[in-house]
Amino acid sequence: VYRIKNILVIVSFTFLFSCKKETENIVKVLPAQTLTDQSYGTDAAQKMDIYLPAGRSSDTTKLIIMIHGGAWVTGDKRDFAIFIPIIQQRLPSYAIANINYRLATNTSNHFPSQENDMKAAINFLLQQSGNYAISQKIVLLGASSGAHLATLQAYKYAEPKISAVVDFFGPVDMAALYNSTTIPFNRSIIEGLMNGTPTSNPLLFQQSSPLNFVTNQSSPTIIFHGDKDEVVPVAQSIALKDKLQSLGVTNQLFIYPNQGHDIWPDPIMTDAFNKTEAFIKSNVK
């Protein structure tokens, strides 16, 4: 009888322990979660929306940070909202952060305010990675001025190491952009952003140009540009591709014929997202 009781106790303990382990495993499967307008700084513009996938973990869940365009003076994270479901469908295991940043005016938020906001947003996400149950592997995806901020962050700063960059028609040489534009309004925007010209403020133009910070350690980069872009000439992306290539950095450049700046038809956007998905899967492990 004594032995039977002991066996029953052991069996009961084993059963309870097994149930406890199964319960713990169930608890660890986190549901999908969306957090809107999360502040990463004290300014009202320093906010982001965060999309966390189900089943995420600090070991396996990588992060895509999306940075909207708008010539550094306009635009909003809402501009990228249409692309969130597309990325979630293609890369379902990724978390996504869609960020706002301070926009420049003639009297405030001159560069490098936007660069500093990028750093602050990334640092916030890294600090909160444990709470969000995401890893510290980051992909930056930006369009136009947002792509400029993405490449500048990735190339200029060794830490944190950015895993990959997706660059939609972003400028990378600010002096060349200023000097080559045939649109007076664009020149005035750059003067307002930089609080000067390449002649009056050469150091800031140099320090704000991603092309100047490319090294053989730079992040893998995929670039998309239209050959009829009059806002950011395709020469900017060609120059970036040439420098990345010369230094042995993994890169791809796709130039779409007869396409301008910002608005591309659905078939081209689908092609770009196909290529983006493949590039990220290949280069971010």
Residue spans of the language-model regions?
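N-terminal cap/lid segment of alpha/beta-hydrolase-fold proteins
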Residues: 22-57
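Primarily recognizes the serine-hydrolase "nucleophile elbow" in alpha/beta-hydrolase
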Residues: 120-180
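Mobile cap/lid helix-loop segments that gate and shape the active-site cleft of serine hydrolases
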Residues: 176-213
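Conserved alpha/beta-hydrolase "acid-adjacent" motif
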Residues: 230-236
